[in-house]
């Protein structure tokens, strides 16, 4: 009998949101060393989020946008202050970072008091004010690239902030932020977010609070970053047929129509993917240039399934993007475990 100890590896348990060990994951000895590829051209690669967002530089965000206040005129933490505090933490843990990519939405325009009685056409640039209600940003750890199922991926950090989640009409109070760290597929800029790389919503009153929370997240993730990647890569070892894919899509549509009580009775996991994302994943199954089903095969891998859904949720509003991205990862892991027979909660999507 073979008594050789099997290599262990962390495994994401989507229903619990915890990390465990698994003997089936890819051994750590198989991890390739970091390689340096050409720098990513920010003007010639897919955006990490689409929806109704637009690009802006950190300089424009800092110099051309006002900072909203609370009702008592106390300043909120600026978007620029948020980004810079997380970057400081990122450099402390990971070293050199690439320039930040920023996407914003929901522009709020105004004017200075001296121009209150002017027509819009008469306003000068100096009399106009603006800020963006929602912000998402990302930057990469410089020179750190790995390969997952033949695709180069970059370790990245970033965050999301939405003023609409703060109580600006009251007195100064804690503000909400989200920070993440994870692997981003280079060819499509899809983020593969797992529960151990995402803070969720947290409250902060100062940039020091933000930096402290970022340091906690990054310091906890850094020692296991390659294990995290190999857990994702293991999705490429499991395939689903076209019939199974269609069954999953049908179940996802049915899931949205089920009453909450029925979902609870069936023991179903929490799925927050909307019909628009499901439809986009179906189109991607046929059309996506990187992850569609190949003509000579009758199946796709669960890594392809994950990327189809990750691509789909890039059309989500900024303030919901990270939660839905992580939900995609949980769903792919759940289907993998259902096929293995280790997670009955997701078996419903395969029946």
Describe every region a protein language model picked out:
Residues 59-176:
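Compositionally biased, flexible interaction segments
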Residues 1-42, 122-351:
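Intrinsically disordered, low-complexity regions enriched in serine/threonine
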Residues 1-87, 94-106:
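Feature for intrinsically disordered/low-complexity regulatory segments and propeptides
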């Amino acid at each position: 009998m073979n008594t050789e100890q099997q290599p262990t590896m962390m495994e994401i348990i989507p229903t619990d949101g915890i990390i465990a060990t698994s003997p089936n994951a890819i051994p750590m000895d198989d991890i390739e060393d970091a390689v340096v590829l050409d720098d990513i051209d920010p003007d010639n690669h897919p955006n990490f989020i689409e929806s109704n967002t637009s690009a802006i530089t950190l300089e424009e965000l800092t110099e051309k946008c006002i900072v909203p206040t609370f009702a008592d005129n106390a300043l909120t933490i600026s978007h620029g202050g948020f980004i810079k505090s997380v970057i400081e933490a990122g450099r402390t843990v990971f070293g050199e970072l690439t320039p930040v990519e920023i996407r914003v939405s929901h522009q709020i325009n105004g004017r200075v008091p001296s121009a209150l009685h002017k027509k819009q056409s008469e306003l000068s640039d100096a009399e106009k004010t603006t800020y963006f209600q929602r912000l998402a940003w990302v930057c990469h750890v410089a020179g750190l690239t790995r390969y997952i199922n033949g695709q180069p991926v970059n370790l990245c950090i970033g965050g999301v902030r939405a003023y609409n989640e703060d109580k600006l009409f009251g007195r100064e109070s804690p503000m909400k932020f989200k920070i993440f760290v994870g692997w981003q597929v280079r060819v499509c800029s899809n983020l593969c977010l797992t529960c151990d790389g995402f803070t969720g919503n947290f409250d902060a009153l100062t940039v020091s609070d933000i930096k402290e929370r970022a340091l906690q997240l990054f310091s906890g993730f850094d020692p296991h970053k390659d294990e995290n990647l190999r857990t994702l890569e293991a999705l490429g070892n499991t395939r689903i047929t076209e019939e199974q894919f269609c069954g999953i899509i049908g179940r996802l549509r049915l899931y949205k129509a089920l009453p909450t009580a029925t979902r609870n009775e069936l023991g179903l996991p929490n799925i927050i993917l909307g019909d628009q994302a499901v439809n986009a994943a179906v189109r991607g199954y046929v059309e996506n240039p990187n992850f569609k089903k190949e003509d000579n095969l009758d199946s796709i891998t669960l890594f392809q399934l994950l990327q189809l859904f990750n691509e789909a949720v890039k059309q989500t509003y900024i303030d919901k993007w990270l939660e839905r991205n992580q939900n995609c990862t949980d769903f792919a892991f759940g289907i993998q475990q259902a096929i293995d027979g280790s997670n009955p909660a997701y078996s419903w999507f395969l029946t």
